[in-house]
Protein backbone atom coordinates (compact mmCIF):
# COMPACT_ATOMS: atom_id res chain seq x y z
CA UNK A 1 0.00 0.00 0.00
CA UNK A 2 1.29 3.46 -0.83
CA UNK A 3 -1.37 5.51 0.97
CA UNK A 4 -4.93 5.71 2.21
CA UNK A 5 -6.68 9.00 1.42
CA UNK A 6 -9.35 10.43 3.71
CA UNK A 7 -11.33 13.54 2.80
CA UNK A 8 -11.84 15.79 5.83
CA UNK A 9 -13.76 19.01 6.42
CA UNK A 10 -10.96 20.88 8.22
CA UNK A 11 -7.37 19.86 7.50
CA UNK A 12 -5.82 21.73 10.42
CA UNK A 13 -8.25 20.22 12.92
CA UNK A 14 -7.59 16.73 11.51
CA UNK A 15 -3.81 17.21 11.59
CA UNK A 16 -4.05 18.20 15.25
CA UNK A 17 -6.33 15.22 16.01
CA UNK A 18 -4.13 12.58 14.36
CA UNK A 19 -1.03 14.02 16.04
CA UNK A 20 -2.67 14.18 19.49
CA UNK A 21 -4.29 10.75 19.27
CA UNK A 22 -1.73 8.69 17.35
CA UNK A 23 1.45 10.78 17.17
CA UNK A 24 1.25 11.13 13.37
CA UNK A 25 3.31 14.02 12.02
CA UNK A 26 2.87 15.44 8.52
CA UNK A 27 5.63 14.70 6.01
CA UNK A 28 4.31 17.71 4.11
CA UNK A 29 1.24 19.94 3.79
CA UNK A 30 0.51 21.48 0.40
CA UNK A 31 -2.19 22.60 -2.02
CA UNK A 32 -3.46 21.45 -5.38
CA UNK A 33 -5.66 22.84 -8.15
CA UNK A 34 -5.88 23.14 -11.92
CA UNK A 35 -7.36 21.30 -14.88
CA UNK A 36 -5.19 18.19 -14.58
CA UNK A 37 -6.11 17.69 -10.92
CA UNK A 38 -9.80 18.35 -11.62
CA UNK A 39 -9.80 15.73 -14.36
CA UNK A 40 -7.82 13.21 -12.30
CA UNK A 41 -10.06 13.37 -9.22
CA UNK A 42 -13.33 13.88 -11.09
CA UNK A 43 -14.18 17.15 -9.32
CA UNK A 44 -14.70 20.13 -11.65
CA UNK A 45 -12.64 23.11 -10.48
CA UNK A 46 -10.95 21.02 -7.77
CA UNK A 47 -9.01 23.05 -5.24
CA UNK A 48 -7.65 21.37 -2.15
CA UNK A 49 -5.22 21.40 0.73
CA UNK A 50 -3.69 18.07 1.66
CA UNK A 51 -1.09 16.41 3.84
CA UNK A 52 0.76 13.11 3.96
CA UNK A 53 1.29 11.51 7.37
CA UNK A 54 3.65 8.51 7.66
CA UNK A 55 2.14 5.43 9.31
CA UNK A 56 4.44 2.41 9.42
CA UNK A 57 5.28 1.42 5.84
CA UNK A 58 2.38 3.41 4.42
CA UNK A 59 0.97 6.90 4.42
CA UNK A 60 -2.33 8.48 5.42
CA UNK A 61 -3.32 11.32 3.10
CA UNK A 62 -5.73 13.90 4.52
CA UNK A 63 -7.50 16.02 1.89
CA UNK A 64 -9.64 19.13 2.41
CA UNK A 65 -11.45 20.23 -0.74
CA UNK A 66 -12.38 23.90 -0.95
CA UNK A 67 -15.12 23.06 -3.45
CA UNK A 68 -18.85 22.95 -2.79
CA UNK A 69 -19.10 19.72 -0.81
CA UNK A 70 -21.16 17.83 1.71
CA UNK A 71 -19.54 18.35 5.11
CA UNK A 72 -21.21 15.46 6.85
CA UNK A 73 -20.14 11.87 6.57
CA UNK A 74 -23.27 9.76 6.20
CA UNK A 75 -21.97 6.22 5.69
CA UNK A 76 -22.51 3.63 8.38
CA UNK A 77 -19.89 0.92 8.86
CA UNK A 78 -22.18 -1.56 7.08
CA UNK A 79 -22.61 0.67 3.99
CA UNK A 80 -20.70 -0.19 0.81
CA UNK A 81 -17.73 2.14 0.45
CA UNK A 82 -17.40 2.92 4.16
CA UNK A 83 -13.67 2.83 4.99
CA UNK A 84 -11.90 2.50 8.29
CA UNK A 85 -8.27 2.99 9.21
CA UNK A 86 -6.85 0.49 11.72
CA UNK A 87 -3.96 1.13 14.10
CA UNK A 88 -2.03 -1.87 15.44
CA UNK A 89 -1.47 -1.60 19.20
CA UNK A 90 0.48 -3.82 21.59
CA UNK A 91 -1.89 -3.32 24.56
CA UNK A 92 -5.45 -2.47 23.60
CA UNK A 93 -6.62 -1.72 27.13
CA UNK A 94 -3.81 0.79 27.67
CA UNK A 95 -4.36 2.33 24.21
CA UNK A 96 -8.11 2.56 24.85
CA UNK A 97 -7.59 4.32 28.20
CA UNK A 98 -4.97 6.67 26.73
CA UNK A 99 -7.20 7.64 23.80
CA UNK A 100 -10.23 8.07 26.08
CA UNK A 101 -8.14 10.44 28.18
CA UNK A 102 -7.42 12.45 25.03
CA UNK A 103 -11.13 12.73 24.22
CA UNK A 104 -11.58 9.84 21.76
CA UNK A 105 -15.17 9.01 20.74
CA UNK A 106 -15.37 5.19 20.89
CA UNK A 107 -18.33 3.10 19.77
CA UNK A 108 -17.67 0.74 22.71
CA UNK A 109 -14.95 -0.62 24.95
CA UNK A 110 -12.57 -3.12 23.31
CA UNK A 111 -14.08 -6.44 22.22
CA UNK A 112 -12.12 -9.72 22.29
CA UNK A 113 -12.89 -12.14 19.43
CA UNK A 114 -14.09 -15.45 20.93
CA UNK A 115 -13.57 -17.82 18.00
CA UNK A 116 -12.63 -18.14 14.36
CA UNK A 117 -9.47 -17.05 12.55
CA UNK A 118 -9.13 -13.91 14.72
CA UNK A 119 -9.74 -15.71 18.03
CA UNK A 120 -7.98 -13.88 20.86
CA UNK A 121 -7.60 -10.62 18.94
CA UNK A 122 -9.18 -7.47 20.36
CA UNK A 123 -10.47 -4.35 18.67
CA UNK A 124 -12.39 -1.14 19.25
CA UNK A 125 -13.84 1.35 16.78
CA UNK A 126 -13.76 5.12 17.27
CA UNK A 127 -14.67 8.21 15.25
CA UNK A 128 -12.41 11.05 14.12
CA UNK A 129 -13.68 14.68 14.15
CA UNK A 130 -15.47 14.15 10.80
CA UNK A 131 -17.10 10.89 11.90
CA UNK A 132 -14.71 8.69 9.89
CA UNK A 133 -14.25 5.30 11.52
CA UNK A 134 -10.89 4.37 13.00
CA UNK A 135 -9.95 1.15 14.77
CA UNK A 136 -7.39 0.05 17.32
CA UNK A 137 -6.44 -3.63 17.05
CA UNK A 138 -4.43 -5.94 19.30
CA UNK A 139 -3.15 -9.21 17.89
CA UNK A 140 -3.88 -12.39 19.87
CA UNK A 141 -1.17 -13.12 22.47
CA UNK A 142 -0.09 -16.29 20.65
CA UNK A 143 0.39 -14.43 17.35
CA UNK A 144 3.37 -12.24 16.52
CA UNK A 145 2.85 -8.51 16.96
CA UNK A 146 3.71 -6.62 13.77
Regions found by a protein language model. Name each.
Residues 65-68, 138-139:
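Acetyl-CoA-dependent GNAT
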Residues 69-97:
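Ampipathic, surface-exposed secondary-structure segments
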Residues 7-57, 94, 101, 119:
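Core segments of cupin and vicinal oxygen chelate
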Residues 1, 48, 80-84, 121:
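Short, solvent-exposed beta-strand edge segments and adjacent coil->beta transition regions
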Residues 31-41, 45, 67-73, 77, ...:
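A cross-kingdom feature marking solvent-exposed beta-strand/loop segments within repeated
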Residues 1, 8-11, 89:
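Short alpha-helical patches at coil-to-helix transitions and adjacent helical residues
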Residues 1, 18, 53, 60-62, ...:
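Short, structured motif recognition centered on aromatic/hydrophobic residues
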Residues 6, 29, 87-146:
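Vicinal oxygen chelate
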Amino acid sequence: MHHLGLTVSNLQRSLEYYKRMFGLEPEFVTTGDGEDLSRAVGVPGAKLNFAFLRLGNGTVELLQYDNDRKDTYGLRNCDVGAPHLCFDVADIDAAYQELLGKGADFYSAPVRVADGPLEGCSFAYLRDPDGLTLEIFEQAPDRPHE
